[in-house]
Protein backbone atom coordinates (compact mmCIF):
# COMPACT_ATOMS: atom_id res chain seq x y z
CA UNK A 1 0.00 0.00 0.00
CA UNK A 2 2.78 2.22 1.00
CA UNK A 3 4.41 1.46 -2.31
CA UNK A 4 1.34 2.51 -4.16
CA UNK A 5 1.12 5.67 -2.16
CA UNK A 6 4.75 6.37 -2.78
CA UNK A 7 4.35 5.83 -6.50
CA UNK A 8 1.24 7.96 -6.49
CA UNK A 9 3.09 10.69 -4.67
CA UNK A 10 5.92 10.46 -7.15
CA UNK A 11 3.46 10.63 -10.01
CA UNK A 12 1.82 13.62 -8.37
CA UNK A 13 5.15 15.31 -8.02
CA UNK A 14 5.93 14.64 -11.65
CA UNK A 15 2.53 15.94 -12.71
CA UNK A 16 3.09 19.00 -10.56
CA UNK A 17 6.45 19.59 -12.05
CA UNK A 18 5.09 19.13 -15.55
CA UNK A 19 2.20 21.44 -14.89
CA UNK A 20 4.41 23.90 -13.06
CA UNK A 21 7.29 24.12 -15.50
CA UNK A 22 6.64 22.22 -18.71
CA UNK A 23 3.07 23.21 -19.44
CA UNK A 24 3.74 27.00 -19.27
CA UNK A 25 6.80 26.59 -21.47
CA UNK A 26 4.92 24.50 -24.00
CA UNK A 27 2.04 26.95 -23.86
CA UNK A 28 4.37 29.82 -24.58
CA UNK A 29 5.96 27.91 -27.41
CA UNK A 30 2.59 27.04 -28.88
CA UNK A 31 1.43 30.65 -28.51
CA UNK A 32 4.61 31.92 -30.20
CA UNK A 33 4.19 29.39 -32.97
CA UNK A 34 0.60 30.44 -33.46
CA UNK A 35 1.66 34.09 -33.58
CA UNK A 36 4.29 33.20 -36.15
CA UNK A 37 1.81 31.31 -38.27
CA UNK A 38 -0.68 34.15 -38.03
CA UNK A 39 2.07 36.65 -39.00
CA UNK A 40 3.07 34.50 -41.93
CA UNK A 41 -0.53 34.23 -43.03
CA UNK A 42 -0.86 38.02 -42.77
CA UNK A 43 2.36 38.49 -44.72
CA UNK A 44 1.16 36.06 -47.35
CA UNK A 45 -2.10 37.95 -47.64
CA UNK A 46 -0.20 41.26 -47.94
CA UNK A 47 2.09 39.73 -50.55
CA UNK A 48 -0.90 38.51 -52.48
CA UNK A 49 -2.34 42.01 -52.34
CA UNK A 50 0.96 43.51 -53.51
CA UNK A 51 1.15 40.96 -56.30
CA UNK A 52 -2.27 41.93 -57.44
CA UNK A 53 -1.37 45.60 -57.27
CA UNK A 54 1.86 44.90 -59.17
CA UNK A 55 -0.05 43.05 -61.83
CA UNK A 56 -2.42 45.97 -62.17
CA UNK A 57 0.52 48.43 -62.26
CA UNK A 58 2.27 46.30 -64.87
CA UNK A 59 -0.83 46.19 -66.99
CA UNK A 60 -1.27 49.96 -66.63
CA UNK A 61 2.44 50.54 -67.39
CA UNK A 62 2.14 48.45 -70.54
CA UNK A 63 -0.84 50.44 -71.63
CA UNK A 64 0.96 53.74 -70.82
CA UNK A 65 4.07 52.54 -72.66
CA UNK A 66 2.05 51.62 -75.71
CA UNK A 67 0.36 55.00 -75.59
CA UNK A 68 3.71 56.83 -75.15
CA UNK A 69 5.31 54.79 -77.90
CA UNK A 70 2.49 55.66 -80.23
CA UNK A 71 2.85 59.34 -79.31
CA UNK A 72 6.64 59.26 -79.82
CA UNK A 73 6.23 57.53 -83.16
CA UNK A 74 3.75 60.15 -84.27
CA UNK A 75 6.01 62.99 -83.11
CA UNK A 76 9.00 61.38 -84.82
CA UNK A 77 7.02 61.01 -88.03
CA UNK A 78 6.00 64.68 -87.83
CA UNK A 79 9.58 65.78 -87.05
CA UNK A 80 10.93 63.62 -89.87
CA UNK A 81 8.54 65.17 -92.33
CA UNK A 82 9.47 68.68 -91.15
CA UNK A 83 13.22 67.92 -91.27
CA UNK A 84 12.84 66.42 -94.72
CA UNK A 85 11.10 69.59 -95.89
CA UNK A 86 13.82 71.77 -94.32
CA UNK A 87 16.61 69.67 -95.83
CA UNK A 88 14.96 69.82 -99.21
CA UNK A 89 14.66 73.61 -98.99
CA UNK A 90 18.25 73.91 -97.74
CA UNK A 91 19.47 71.60 -100.49
CA UNK A 92 17.76 73.77 -103.08
CA UNK A 93 19.40 76.89 -101.62
CA UNK A 94 22.82 75.20 -101.40
CA UNK A 95 22.51 73.85 -104.92
CA UNK A 96 21.72 77.35 -106.20
CA UNK A 97 24.65 78.79 -104.24
CA UNK A 98 27.03 76.15 -105.57
CA UNK A 99 25.73 76.75 -109.06
CA UNK A 100 26.34 80.51 -108.80
CA UNK A 101 29.73 80.00 -107.16
CA UNK A 102 30.67 77.53 -109.86
CA UNK A 103 29.68 80.02 -112.53
CA UNK A 104 31.81 82.71 -110.87
CA UNK A 105 34.70 80.28 -110.51
CA UNK A 106 34.43 79.35 -114.17
CA UNK A 107 34.49 83.06 -115.11
CA UNK A 108 37.48 83.65 -112.85
CA UNK A 109 39.39 80.67 -114.22
CA UNK A 110 38.54 81.75 -117.75
CA UNK A 111 39.85 85.26 -117.02
CA UNK A 112 43.00 83.88 -115.38
CA UNK A 113 43.65 81.51 -118.25
CA UNK A 114 43.06 84.30 -120.74
CA UNK A 115 45.47 86.58 -118.87
CA UNK A 116 48.01 83.79 -118.54
CA UNK A 117 47.77 82.95 -122.21
CA UNK A 118 48.21 86.61 -123.12
CA UNK A 119 51.20 86.86 -120.79
CA UNK A 120 52.78 83.69 -122.14
CA UNK A 121 52.07 84.80 -125.67
CA UNK A 122 53.64 88.17 -124.91
CA UNK A 123 56.73 86.61 -123.32
CA UNK A 124 57.04 84.17 -126.18
CA UNK A 125 56.71 87.03 -128.64
CA UNK A 126 59.42 88.98 -126.83
CA UNK A 127 61.62 85.88 -126.69
CA UNK A 128 61.16 85.26 -130.40
CA UNK A 129 61.83 88.93 -131.09
CA UNK A 130 64.99 88.75 -128.98
CA UNK A 131 66.14 85.69 -130.92
CA UNK A 132 65.41 87.41 -134.22
CA UNK A 133 67.28 90.52 -133.10
CA UNK A 134 70.20 88.46 -131.80
CA UNK A 135 70.42 86.55 -135.07
CA UNK A 136 70.12 89.81 -136.99
CA UNK A 137 72.91 91.58 -135.11
CA UNK A 138 75.16 88.51 -135.26
CA UNK A 139 76.26 90.05 -138.53
CA UNK A 140 78.73 92.79 -137.60
CA UNK A 141 77.55 94.94 -140.47
CA UNK A 142 73.96 94.82 -139.21
CA UNK A 143 75.09 95.53 -135.65
CA UNK A 144 77.12 98.49 -136.86
CA UNK A 145 74.06 99.69 -138.79
CA UNK A 146 72.08 99.86 -135.52
CA UNK A 147 74.71 102.25 -134.18
CA UNK A 148 74.51 104.38 -137.31
CA UNK A 149 70.71 104.55 -137.07
CA UNK A 150 70.94 105.61 -133.44
CA UNK A 151 73.48 108.29 -134.36
CA UNK A 152 71.07 109.54 -137.03
CA UNK A 153 68.34 109.83 -134.40
CA UNK A 154 70.75 111.47 -131.99
CA UNK A 155 71.83 113.93 -134.65
CA UNK A 156 68.21 115.00 -135.09
CA UNK A 157 67.73 115.73 -131.39
CA UNK A 158 67.19 119.31 -130.33
CA UNK A 159 70.36 120.83 -128.90
CA UNK A 160 70.50 120.79 -125.12
CA UNK A 161 72.86 122.75 -122.93
CA UNK A 162 75.03 121.12 -120.31
CA UNK A 163 77.60 122.68 -118.05
CA UNK A 164 80.97 121.11 -117.44
CA UNK A 165 80.75 119.15 -114.20
CA UNK A 166 83.69 119.96 -111.91
CA UNK A 167 83.41 117.07 -109.43
CA UNK A 168 85.15 118.67 -106.46
CA UNK A 169 83.25 121.96 -106.77
CA UNK A 170 79.98 120.02 -106.72
CA UNK A 171 80.86 118.68 -103.25
CA UNK A 172 81.61 122.09 -101.72
CA UNK A 173 79.58 125.00 -100.45
CA UNK A 174 79.87 128.51 -101.82
CA UNK A 175 82.83 129.77 -99.75
CA UNK A 176 84.92 126.70 -100.50
CA UNK A 177 83.97 126.83 -104.19
CA UNK A 178 85.22 130.41 -104.44
CA UNK A 179 88.39 129.52 -102.55
CA UNK A 180 89.11 126.48 -104.72
CA UNK A 181 88.47 128.36 -107.96
CA UNK A 182 90.81 131.13 -106.86
CA UNK A 183 93.48 128.64 -105.74
CA UNK A 184 93.35 126.67 -109.01
CA UNK A 185 93.53 129.85 -111.10
CA UNK A 186 96.52 131.03 -109.07
CA UNK A 187 98.20 127.65 -109.42
CA UNK A 188 97.68 127.66 -113.19
CA UNK A 189 99.81 130.78 -113.41
CA UNK A 190 102.34 129.61 -110.85
CA UNK A 191 102.80 126.19 -112.52
CA UNK A 192 104.17 127.81 -115.68
CA UNK A 193 107.43 128.46 -113.83
CA UNK A 194 107.89 124.82 -112.77
CA UNK A 195 109.61 122.15 -114.83
CA UNK A 196 108.82 118.43 -114.98
CA UNK A 197 110.73 117.60 -111.80
CA UNK A 198 109.30 120.59 -109.97
CA UNK A 199 105.72 119.59 -110.71
CA UNK A 200 106.38 115.97 -109.74
CA UNK A 201 107.98 117.01 -106.44
CA UNK A 202 105.19 119.48 -105.76
CA UNK A 203 102.52 116.81 -106.25
CA UNK A 204 104.25 114.34 -103.92
CA UNK A 205 104.84 116.94 -101.19
CA UNK A 206 101.26 118.17 -101.32
CA UNK A 207 99.97 114.62 -100.88
CA UNK A 208 102.25 114.16 -97.85
CA UNK A 209 100.93 117.38 -96.31
CA UNK A 210 97.34 116.32 -97.04
CA UNK A 211 97.96 113.02 -95.21
CA UNK A 212 99.44 114.96 -92.29
CA UNK A 213 96.44 117.28 -92.06
CA UNK A 214 94.09 114.31 -92.30
CA UNK A 215 95.77 112.77 -89.24
CA UNK A 216 95.98 116.07 -87.30
CA UNK A 217 92.35 117.16 -87.14
CA UNK A 218 93.07 119.87 -84.54
CA UNK A 219 95.70 121.51 -86.75
CA UNK A 220 93.35 121.38 -89.74
CA UNK A 221 90.61 123.03 -87.69
CA UNK A 222 92.95 125.91 -86.76
CA UNK A 223 94.04 126.28 -90.40
CA UNK A 224 90.42 126.71 -91.50
CA UNK A 225 89.28 129.16 -88.81
CA UNK A 226 87.18 131.74 -90.72
CA UNK A 227 89.08 134.82 -89.53
CA UNK A 228 89.65 137.90 -91.67
CA UNK A 229 93.37 137.98 -90.83
CA UNK A 230 95.05 134.96 -92.40
CA UNK A 231 98.48 135.73 -90.90
CA UNK A 232 98.13 133.33 -87.91
CA UNK A 233 97.12 130.50 -90.22
CA UNK A 234 100.04 131.20 -92.57
CA UNK A 235 102.51 131.27 -89.65
CA UNK A 236 101.11 127.96 -88.37
CA UNK A 237 101.51 126.18 -91.71
CA UNK A 238 105.03 127.62 -92.07
CA UNK A 239 106.05 126.30 -88.63
CA UNK A 240 104.48 122.96 -89.50
CA UNK A 241 106.20 122.28 -92.86
CA UNK A 242 109.13 124.70 -93.22
CA UNK A 243 112.30 122.81 -94.08
CA UNK A 244 110.29 119.71 -94.99
CA UNK A 245 108.89 120.83 -98.35
CA UNK A 246 110.15 122.90 -101.22
CA UNK A 247 109.45 126.58 -101.79
CA UNK A 248 106.72 126.00 -104.44
CA UNK A 249 104.87 123.63 -102.12
CA UNK A 250 105.12 126.07 -99.23
CA UNK A 251 103.81 128.86 -101.44
CA UNK A 252 100.81 126.72 -102.47
CA UNK A 253 100.09 125.92 -98.82
CA UNK A 254 100.34 129.60 -97.82
CA UNK A 255 97.86 130.50 -100.53
CA UNK A 256 95.52 127.64 -99.58
CA UNK A 257 95.32 128.44 -95.85
CA UNK A 258 94.81 132.13 -96.61
CA UNK A 259 91.46 131.27 -98.21
CA UNK A 260 88.19 130.80 -96.35
CA UNK A 261 86.84 127.25 -96.36
CA UNK A 262 83.35 126.09 -95.49
CA UNK A 263 84.55 122.80 -93.93
CA UNK A 264 87.81 121.47 -92.52
CA UNK A 265 87.93 118.64 -95.04
CA UNK A 266 87.64 121.12 -97.93
CA UNK A 267 91.19 122.34 -97.28
CA UNK A 268 92.55 118.78 -97.57
CA UNK A 269 90.47 118.20 -100.70
CA UNK A 270 91.84 121.41 -102.21
CA UNK A 271 95.46 120.46 -101.49
CA UNK A 272 94.89 117.02 -103.03
CA UNK A 273 93.21 118.66 -106.02
CA UNK A 274 96.20 120.94 -106.65
CA UNK A 275 98.54 117.94 -106.48
CA UNK A 276 96.42 116.26 -109.17
CA UNK A 277 96.46 119.41 -111.28
CA UNK A 278 100.27 119.41 -111.10
CA UNK A 279 100.45 115.86 -112.47
CA UNK A 280 97.81 116.57 -115.12
CA UNK A 281 99.85 119.60 -116.16
CA UNK A 282 102.74 117.21 -116.83
CA UNK A 283 100.48 115.02 -118.98
CA UNK A 284 99.23 118.04 -120.89
CA UNK A 285 102.76 119.27 -121.60
CA UNK A 286 103.67 115.80 -122.89
CA UNK A 287 100.52 115.59 -125.01
CA UNK A 288 99.36 112.53 -123.06
CA UNK A 289 96.11 113.83 -121.56
CA UNK A 290 93.90 111.56 -123.68
CA UNK A 291 96.00 108.54 -122.74
CA UNK A 292 95.86 109.44 -119.04
CA UNK A 293 92.09 109.91 -119.11
CA UNK A 294 91.55 106.66 -120.97
CA UNK A 295 93.75 104.65 -118.60
CA UNK A 296 92.06 106.14 -115.54
CA UNK A 297 88.60 105.22 -116.80
CA UNK A 298 89.84 101.79 -117.82
CA UNK A 299 91.22 101.15 -114.32
CA UNK A 300 87.91 102.34 -112.86
CA UNK A 301 86.08 99.71 -114.91
CA UNK A 302 88.60 97.06 -113.78
CA UNK A 303 87.76 97.85 -110.16
CA UNK A 304 84.05 97.52 -110.96
CA UNK A 305 84.51 93.98 -112.28
CA UNK A 306 87.20 92.99 -109.73
CA UNK A 307 85.61 93.69 -106.33
CA UNK A 308 88.32 91.69 -104.54
CA UNK A 309 90.99 94.07 -105.82
CA UNK A 310 88.85 97.06 -104.82
CA UNK A 311 88.48 95.65 -101.30
CA UNK A 312 92.24 95.11 -100.93
CA UNK A 313 93.13 98.59 -102.21
CA UNK A 314 90.47 100.21 -100.03
CA UNK A 315 91.23 98.36 -96.79
CA UNK A 316 92.19 101.23 -94.50
CA UNK A 317 93.26 98.73 -91.81
CA UNK A 318 96.31 98.06 -93.99
CA UNK A 319 98.99 100.80 -94.06
CA UNK A 320 98.84 103.03 -97.13
CA UNK A 321 102.35 101.99 -98.18
CA UNK A 322 101.25 98.35 -98.46
CA UNK A 323 98.21 99.23 -100.53
CA UNK A 324 100.32 101.41 -102.84
CA UNK A 325 102.80 98.53 -103.34
CA UNK A 326 99.90 96.27 -104.28
CA UNK A 327 98.62 98.89 -106.74
CA UNK A 328 102.03 99.24 -108.39
CA UNK A 329 102.35 95.44 -108.73
CA UNK A 330 98.96 95.29 -110.43
CA UNK A 331 99.88 98.11 -112.80
CA UNK A 332 103.26 96.52 -113.61
CA UNK A 333 101.49 93.34 -114.70
CA UNK A 334 99.16 95.20 -117.07
CA UNK A 335 99.10 94.12 -120.70
CA UNK A 336 100.14 97.59 -121.86
CA UNK A 337 102.49 100.14 -120.37
CA UNK A 338 100.80 102.39 -117.82
CA UNK A 339 101.54 106.09 -118.09
CA UNK A 340 103.74 107.28 -115.17
CA UNK A 341 101.31 110.12 -114.50
CA UNK A 342 98.51 107.56 -114.10
CA UNK A 343 100.66 105.54 -111.69
CA UNK A 344 101.33 108.65 -109.60
CA UNK A 345 97.69 109.78 -109.63
CA UNK A 346 96.40 106.36 -108.61
CA UNK A 347 99.07 105.97 -105.92
CA UNK A 348 98.20 109.35 -104.39
CA UNK A 349 94.49 108.49 -104.54
CA UNK A 350 95.01 105.20 -102.69
CA UNK A 351 97.09 107.02 -100.05
CA UNK A 352 94.33 109.60 -99.45
CA UNK A 353 91.16 107.49 -99.56
CA UNK A 354 89.96 108.78 -96.16
CA UNK A 355 87.21 106.18 -95.88
CA UNK A 356 86.00 106.52 -99.47
CA UNK A 357 85.49 103.41 -101.60
CA UNK A 358 88.46 103.03 -103.93
CA UNK A 359 86.31 102.48 -107.04
CA UNK A 360 84.44 105.73 -106.34
CA UNK A 361 87.69 107.59 -105.69
CA UNK A 362 89.25 106.41 -108.97
CA UNK A 363 86.15 107.31 -110.98
CA UNK A 364 86.16 110.73 -109.27
CA UNK A 365 89.83 111.12 -110.25
CA UNK A 366 89.04 110.29 -113.89
CA UNK A 367 86.25 112.86 -113.92
CA UNK A 368 88.62 115.47 -112.45
CA UNK A 369 91.07 114.77 -115.27
CA UNK A 370 88.37 115.27 -117.90
CA UNK A 371 86.92 118.39 -116.27
CA UNK A 372 90.36 120.04 -116.28
CA UNK A 373 90.08 120.52 -120.04
CA UNK A 374 86.51 121.81 -119.75
CA UNK A 375 85.14 118.60 -121.23
CA UNK A 376 82.01 116.59 -120.48
CA UNK A 377 82.32 112.86 -119.86
CA UNK A 378 79.90 110.67 -121.80
CA UNK A 379 79.69 107.09 -120.56
CA UNK A 380 78.76 105.11 -123.68
CA UNK A 381 77.68 101.48 -123.72
CA UNK A 382 77.79 99.46 -126.94
CA UNK A 383 77.47 95.82 -127.93
CA UNK A 384 80.74 95.93 -129.90
CA UNK A 385 83.66 98.21 -130.59
CA UNK A 386 82.83 101.33 -132.58
CA UNK A 387 84.66 102.11 -135.74
CA UNK A 388 86.84 105.20 -135.84
CA UNK A 389 84.26 106.95 -138.00
CA UNK A 390 81.44 106.09 -135.58
CA UNK A 391 83.45 107.22 -132.56
CA UNK A 392 84.34 110.49 -134.27
CA UNK A 393 80.74 111.10 -135.33
CA UNK A 394 79.46 110.29 -131.83
CA UNK A 395 81.90 112.76 -130.28
CA UNK A 396 80.92 115.48 -132.76
CA UNK A 397 77.18 114.93 -132.27
CA UNK A 398 77.42 114.95 -128.47
CA UNK A 399 79.65 118.03 -128.52
CA UNK A 400 77.09 119.83 -130.68
CA UNK A 401 74.18 118.75 -128.48
CA UNK A 402 75.77 119.71 -125.17
CA UNK A 403 77.72 122.73 -126.37
CA UNK A 404 81.01 121.52 -124.84
CA UNK A 405 83.82 119.19 -125.86
CA UNK A 406 82.87 115.63 -124.96
CA UNK A 407 85.11 112.76 -123.92
CA UNK A 408 83.63 109.38 -124.80
CA UNK A 409 84.30 106.50 -122.44
CA UNK A 410 83.20 103.32 -124.20
CA UNK A 411 82.03 100.24 -122.30
CA UNK A 412 81.46 97.04 -124.31
CA UNK A 413 78.55 94.81 -123.26
CA UNK A 414 77.35 92.18 -125.73
CA UNK A 415 74.04 91.94 -123.84
CA UNK A 416 73.06 95.35 -125.27
CA UNK A 417 72.66 93.61 -128.69
CA UNK A 418 72.84 96.83 -130.70
CA UNK A 419 72.49 100.60 -130.61
CA UNK A 420 74.08 102.78 -127.92
CA UNK A 421 73.48 103.83 -124.33
CA UNK A 422 74.78 107.30 -123.42
CA UNK A 423 74.99 108.72 -119.89
CA UNK A 424 76.06 112.32 -119.39
CA UNK A 425 75.78 113.25 -115.74
CA UNK A 426 72.25 112.42 -114.62
CA UNK A 427 70.92 112.35 -118.20
CA UNK A 428 70.68 108.95 -119.86
CA UNK A 429 69.88 108.34 -123.53
CA UNK A 430 69.23 104.62 -123.97
CA UNK A 431 68.90 103.55 -127.58
CA UNK A 432 70.01 99.95 -127.18
CA UNK A 433 68.03 97.08 -128.64
CA UNK A 434 68.05 95.29 -125.28
CA UNK A 435 66.33 98.24 -123.58
CA UNK A 436 63.64 98.31 -126.26
CA UNK A 437 63.00 94.60 -125.78
CA UNK A 438 62.92 95.09 -122.01
CA UNK A 439 60.44 97.96 -122.42
CA UNK A 440 58.22 95.77 -124.59
CA UNK A 441 58.35 93.02 -121.97
CA UNK A 442 57.56 95.49 -119.18
CA UNK A 443 54.38 96.56 -120.97
CA UNK A 444 53.04 93.00 -120.87
CA UNK A 445 50.04 92.50 -118.54
CA UNK A 446 50.78 91.20 -115.08
UniProtKB/Swiss-Prot annotation:
TM region positions: 4-24
Annotated membrane topology: Single-pass membrane protein
Region (ATP synthase subunit b): 1-168
GO biological process: proton motive force-driven ATP synthesis
One cellular component (GO) term of this entry: plasma membrane
Lineage: superkingdom: Bacteria
Main location: membrane
Summary of the function given for this chain in its UniProt record: F(1)F(0) ATP synthase produces ATP from ADP in the presence of a proton or sodium gradient. F-type ATPases consist of two structural domains, F(1) containing the extramembraneous catalytic core and F(0) containing the membrane proton channel, linked together by a central stalk and a peripheral stalk. During catalysis, ATP synthesis in the catalytic domain of F(1) is coupled via a rotary mechanism of the central stalk subunits to proton translocation. This fusion protein includes a component of the F(0) channel (subunit b) and of the F(1) subunit (subunit delta). Two copies of subunit b and one of delta together form the peripheral 'stator' stalk which links F(1) to F(0).
PANTHER family: ATP SYNTHASE DELTA CHAIN (PTHR11910)
Subunit organization: F-type ATPases have 2 components, F(1) - the catalytic core - and F(0) - the membrane proton channel. F(1) has five subunits: alpha(3), beta(3), gamma(1), delta(1), epsilon(1). F(0) has three main subunits: a(1), b(2) and c(10-14). The alpha and beta chains form an alternating ring which encloses part of the gamma chain. F(1) is attached to F(0) by a central stalk formed by the gamma and epsilon chains, while a peripheral stalk is formed by the delta and b chains.
Name of the protein in question: ATP synthase subunit b-delta
Amino acid sequence: MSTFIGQLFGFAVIVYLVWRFIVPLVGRLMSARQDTVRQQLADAAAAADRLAEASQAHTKALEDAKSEAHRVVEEARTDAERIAEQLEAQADVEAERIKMQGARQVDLIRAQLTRQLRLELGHESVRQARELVRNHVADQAQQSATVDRFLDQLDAMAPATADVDYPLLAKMRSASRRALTSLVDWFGTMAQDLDHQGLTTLAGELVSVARLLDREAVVTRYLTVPAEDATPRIRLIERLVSGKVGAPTLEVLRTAVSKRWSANSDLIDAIEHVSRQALLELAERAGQVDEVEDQLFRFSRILDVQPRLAILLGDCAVPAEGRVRLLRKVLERADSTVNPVVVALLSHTVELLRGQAVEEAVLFLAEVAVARRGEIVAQVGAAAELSDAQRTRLTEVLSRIYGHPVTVQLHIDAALLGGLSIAVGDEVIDGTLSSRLAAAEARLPD
